[in-house]
Design a protein with these regions (language model features):
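N-terminal juxtamembrane cytosolic/stromal segments of multi-pass membrane proteins
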Residues: 1-30
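C-terminal ends of transmembrane helices
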Residues: 21, 73-90, 132-139, 183-191
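Structural signature of hydrophobic alpha-helical transmembrane segments
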Residues: 59-70, 113-128, 173
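Selected alpha-helical membrane-embedding segments in polytopic membrane proteins
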Residues: 25-112
Length: 196
């Protein structure tokens, strides 16, 4: 293809095709990451919550450290072989960068909460950060359930601040179910049952 300046209409059409290509690939591939991280978070939350309640010892909060391990393990187990010649588009890179920033931010705040004397409302902060990342992803790929799930998590996040200790983990779990697990299953369903 020769280098030339694109006219405005050609440029918009190219951007539209890139978004649509990414969106169609996202519909096929996006369900697994949402499900892996959603289920990893829910399972870890239940484990931490149950251990802290049963043993009455806050040191069980260190179980949160298994979340990234479980999430990456589920991602690895559920991976699929990439087709030869698949190209990463600009939109793919944008979404990857969004999640790199959100993930590193969540990790940094979590480390502060676990290893410093700071008292941080960690469930609120993490639900808010992940809700923002999910909303941005849903808006970029133009997939309403993902965007709405992210907004629902953002709205739910402040309720973790006013809920008692017993209810905070349940609200956190509900946020991840609405934000990642439900949209992840919808994406998988749509990819397995394409519109005709």
């Amino acid at each position: 293809m020769e280098d030339r300046k694109l006219e405005a209409a050609e440029s918009l059409a190219l951007i539209g095709r890139m978004i649509e290509n990414t969106r169609s690939r996202m519909v096929r591939n996006s369900g697994r990451p949402l499900l892996a991280w959603g289920y990893a978070t829910v399972l870890t939350t239940f484990a931490v919550w149950g251990a802290v309640l049963y043993f009455q010892n806050p040191r069980w909060n260190y179980l949160w450290l298994m979340l990234p391990l479980l999430g990456w393990l589920l991602m690895w187990v559920s991976r699929e072989k990439k087709p030869e010649g698949e190209v990463r588009t600009f939109v793919d890179r944008v979404i990857g960068n969004v999640w790199t920033v959100m993930g590193l931010s969540a990790w940094f705040v979590s480390m502060l909460a676990l290893f410093t004397p700071m008292r941080l409302p960690i469930l609120f902060i993490i639900l808010l950060i992940m809700g923002m990342g999910t909303t941005v992803t849903g808006l970029i790929i133009r997939f309403t359930p993902t965007a709405v799930g992210g907004v629902a998590a953002i709205i739910l996040a402040p309720f973790t601040l006013i809920a008692g200790n017993m209810w905070q983990p349940l609200l956190f779990i509900a946020g991840f179910v609405v934000m990642m697990i439900v949209p992840g299953h919808i994406l998988n369903y749509k990819s397995n049952h394409p519109a005709r």
